[in-house]
Each structure stands twice: as structure tokens, then as C-alpha cells.
Amino acid sequence: VSAPFEPGEHALLLDQRGRTYLVLLQAGGTFHSHSGTLAHDEILGRPEGTRLETANGMVLTAFRPLLSDHVLKMKRGAQVVYPKDLGPILMFADIHPGARVLEAGTGSAALTIALCRTVGESGKVVSYEAREEHMEQARKNLGGFFGKIPDQLQLRDGDVAEVAATGERFERCVLDLPEPWGPLEAIHGALEPGGVLCAYLPTTIQVQQLVLELPHSGFLHIQTFETLRRGWHVTERSVRPDHRMIGHTGFLTVARRLA
């Protein structure tokens, strides 16, 4: 059952033109936009899907935000992995409840959030980030989404190659690094035989170097692909593709660890 909105949680406000706004609700707070002002108290205590009028007479509809809404509107230290790529990563890296996942490149934590939600409380995510400023923003974004750093997540400052010294073992590894071929030896040692490695890379040069290195580092069944998202405009009179589409954001390279 969907509970009424409470102070301290986020609401997604949808205006009549389809624009969305992510708002942290506070008693006595006020939302300001081109659509006018709306007191947070008008939202608090009401269920999702409630339609409200601003001081200018514009209608806003309040929903709880989806993960994709958080990702698109979160503050960024590093470039985020977009929703159109998050889904394929979770699918092709075979992230499942209870999985032990190694992540390198926490960045703004969009992918980290998706991993933590998918593995659940019975799973484990260990995420490395070499840049202090990115880790600081990641912690804020994780706290904003979960309310705290989730119990199944360990955040570590430093290079993912340091995992070799821990003796830990993982079933899956997800990389968002500019040079993912560098720590392959350490990652091979940390992955279980048959484990999945999935790397997110923006350029073909990076992909080529990684794919050429993977067989020499104990990986096989290598696949590379990208996902494109094209929206459609549907009305009574016509059905046509949108004038704009979300094209290239990054490539995914997936491989399996040999014994």
C-alpha cells in the first residue's frame, strides 16, 4: 500500500508540460518553479498521484520518484551511467539478489545505487573510487537515495587493484574506469571461475584496448554492444518517432573469467 508523503522524503512533481522536479519535502517548505509556488504542506499527508494547484493556478501531480528520476537529477561529481545503460548492465552482468559484486569507479554512485538495490540485504557490493571529490559526492547521493549508506555496501578510497591484497572473492565485477585493462590481473584473482566482468566505456579506442587484453588476462566469451533509446510521439492523429533520441552514451563489454 502506498503511504502518504512524509517530511524528509522526495517527491517528483510533474507539470502540465511534462517537466519534472525532484523536491525534498520539509514541513513549512515551499516549491518554486515557472509553474508558480506550492507549499510542501499541500503535498505532505497526501497519497501519490495527487493533483495540486500552484499559486498561479497551474496543476502539478505528485509521485514518488523512480530510480531513473534520481539518476537523471542527482548532483554529479563524475558523469553518471544513464538509465538506458543501467538496465543492460544489471542484465548482462547478471546481477541478482545475494550476489557479491566488485565495482570500480564509484563516481556519482548511480550504478552503485542500482547494484545495491538489486543484490539486496543478502548481497554485497564493494566499490572503489580513486578520486576523493567523487567519493564525497557519491556518499551524498547514496544518503539522499537510501537515507544512509546501505549495510550491503562497502565504499573504499583507492585503486581497485588493492583488492588483490584482501583475499576477497566476488561473483561479478563492474568497471567504470578510463583504463580498465590496468587492474585486470587483480580482478581476475578476485573473481570466481565463471564470474562476469562488465566494463562501461565511452570510446571505441578504450573498448579495443580492453577487448584485446582480456584473452591474455584469463577472460573469454567477450561481447561488446551499445544501447540506443528512441522515444515515440503518440497522439490520436499520428504515431511517429520523437525528433530527438538518446544515442551513444557508452559501450558495454562483457566477459567471463576462465578457471
Residue ranges and their predicted role:
Residues 1-64:
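N-terminal auxiliary segments of SAM/dcSAM-dependent transferases
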Residues 2-3, 73-86:
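Conserved SAM-binding loop and adjacent beta-strand
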Residues 91-96, 118, 146-147, 164, ...:
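Glycine-rich helix-loop-beta junction characteristic of Rossmann-like nucleotide cofactor-binding loops
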Residues 96-107:
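Conserved class I S-adenosyl-L-methionine
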Residues 99, 123, 195:
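Glycine-centered, small-residue-biased loops immediately flanking beta-strands
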Residues 108-121, 188-189:
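Conserved SAM-binding loop of SAM-dependent methyltransferases across substrates and taxa
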Residues 184-251:
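C-terminal substrate-binding/active-site "lid" region of AdoMet-derived donor-dependent transferases
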